[in-house]
């Protein structure tokens, strides 16, 4: 039996509340305040699935939110000192930072928590009228009869490990939109489906990936 699903309609649905998805929603709202925009975030809260900290160059943020310094942003700690080292088996060798390409020099940048930046960007987006739904993972792409993307479906809830519906089962929603933006990150499963379905990687160099580790340090507040 086909599951009956509730549906919602938007001008734009964005999959993923990372920096790209949040910045997209803010720019769209700045350009056209009447747009009806929602963001789906699989994490329990915005920032929950952000991998790491960040040495942050503010140029893009300066363009997006020029007065970010006056809006209680979490961007506070400037880079005060940096070293570039070549590591050997027993020793390291320092290289003068002024000889490095400008893209590798961080003296004007900030050290931030990327998760905190995303949370702050989320408040800026919501202040503009963007709707953000944490805890809702987009699990399926919805196509029309002409193979055009017309939205996404969120995951069903209340399913046991064997795949059976529990008493608490709730079907996912169909989120329809005129434009669907996929900002899941480098290996999002919906993004991979789109790439495969429409041969977007044809003639392109294969993507390269690195392994990331997330380590959380708790530091007394008086030390930062």
Language-model features and meaning:
Residues 4-6, 174:
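Short, flexible hinge/linker loops that cap or flank conserved catalytic cores
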Residues 49-51, 96-97, 192-195:
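Short, solvent-exposed loop/turn and secondary-structure capping segments
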Residues 103-123, 133:
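Short beta-strand to alpha-helix junction loop
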Residues 10-38:
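N-terminal Rossmann-like FAD-binding beta1-loop-alpha1 element of flavoenzymes
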Residues 20, 45, 187:
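Conserved Rossmann-like nucleotide-cofactor binding loop
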Residues 115, 124-224:
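Predominantly flavin-linked oxidoreductase catalytic cores and closely associated redox partners
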Residues 42-90:
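N-terminal FAD cofactor-binding segment of flavoenzymes
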């Amino acid at each position: 039996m086909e599951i009956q699903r509730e549906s919602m309609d938007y001008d734009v649905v964005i999959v993923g509340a990372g920096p790209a998805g949040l910045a997209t929603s803010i720019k769209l709202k700045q350009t056209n305040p009447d747009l009806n925009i929602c963001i789906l975030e699989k994490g329990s809260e915005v920032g929950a699935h952000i991998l790491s900290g960040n040495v942050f160059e503010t140029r893009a943020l300066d363009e997006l939110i020029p007065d970010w310094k006056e809006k209680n942003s979490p961007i506070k700690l400037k880079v005060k000192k940096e070293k570039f080292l070549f590591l050997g088996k027993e020793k390291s060798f320092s290289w003068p930072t002024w000889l490095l390409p400008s893209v590798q020099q961080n003296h004007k940048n900030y050290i931030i928590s990327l998760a905190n930046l995303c949370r702050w960007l989320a408040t800026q987006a919501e202040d503009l009228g963007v709707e953000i739904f944490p805890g809702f993972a987009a699990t399926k792409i919805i196509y029309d009869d002409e193979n055009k993307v017309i939205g996404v479906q969120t995951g069903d809830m209340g399913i046991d490990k064997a795949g059976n519906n529990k008493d608490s089962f709730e079907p996912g929603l169909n989120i329809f939109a005129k434009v669907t933006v996929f900002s899941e990150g480098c290996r999002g499963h919906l993004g991979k489906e789109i790439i495969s379905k429409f041969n977007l990687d044809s003639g392109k160099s294969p993507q390269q990936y690195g392994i990331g580790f997330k380590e959380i340090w708790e530091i007394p507040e008086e030390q930062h």
